[in-house]
């Protein structure tokens, strides 16, 4: 879907502080369930992340939840981009919900084996991943205003139930082996220990932006499945 650059430029000048004239809109082409674009102005760069057009599964593509959690983590040890604005209704140039965040120039590694770097660098990258994950799970959800971000109760049961429903809504044919997998998962759910922490939901190497010259993570992305 092509975006009306003139209309979007006028809209963002109203809603994003210090937004100047929009020069170009470039769609990121790799692995985005929510369409994501780089916006280049005369003075800066931004990222626009939107719900896809058309009919969507209930609770899928929750860019408003992404915006909320990224904004809440702004002053924590978890590296996230700055967010500037959420268009939380359809009365905008895209006709669907989207948000604007900071563009972070850095490195993204798509292959988990990271063959393009040496062993020491690879070790450093994965150490940074472990550190950010520990920082995330140490966030006090009450202090950052996310006490109501997730639903109460057994997380494992909720996740299993959610994905079973998503599968059954979107399946095309009967798959007996999938029913066996579902039964196995439902019979083997771990007991909920009552501990609560923030979960990213899609924590993997290519959802992170690394500093250009070090193994430091400068931005953890794609919070669509966070809870």
Task: Indicate where each model-derived feature is located.
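Tryptophan-centered motif/residue detector
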Residues: 10-11, 163, 184, 223
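Juxta-kinase regulatory segment immediately upstream of eukaryotic protein kinase catalytic domains
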Residues: 1-23
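ATP-binding pocket architecture of kinase catalytic cores
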Residues: 22-180, 184-198, 212-214
């Amino acid at each position: 879907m092509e975006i009306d650059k003139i209309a979007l430029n006028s809209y963002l000048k109203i809603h994003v502080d210090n937004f100047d004239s929009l020069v170009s809109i470039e769609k990121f082409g790799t692995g985005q369930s929510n369409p994501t674009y780089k916006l280049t102005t005369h003075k800066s760069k931004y990222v626009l992340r939107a719900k896809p057009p058309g009919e969507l599964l209930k609770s899928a593509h929750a860019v408003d939840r992404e915006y909320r959690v990224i904004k809440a983590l702004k002053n924590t040890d978890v590296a996230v981009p700055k967010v500037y604005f959420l268009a939380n209704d359809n009365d905008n140039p895209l006709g669907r919900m989207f948000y604007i965040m900071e563009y972070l120039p850095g490195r993204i590694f798509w292959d988990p084996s990271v063959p393009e770097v040496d062993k020491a660098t690879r070790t450093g990258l994965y150490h940074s991943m472990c550190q950010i994950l520990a920082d995330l799970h140490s966030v006090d959800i009450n202090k950052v205003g996310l006490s109501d971000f997730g639903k109460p109760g057994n997380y494992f049961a909720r996740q299993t139930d959610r994905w079973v429903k998503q599968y059954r809504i979107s399946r095309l044919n009967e798959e007996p082996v999938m029913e066996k997998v579902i039964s196995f998962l439902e019979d083997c759910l771990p007991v909920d220990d009552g501990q609560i922490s923030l979960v990213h939901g899609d924590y993997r190497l290519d959802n992170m932006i690394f500093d250009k010259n070090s193994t430091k993570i400068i931005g953890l992305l794609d919070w669509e499945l966070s809870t």
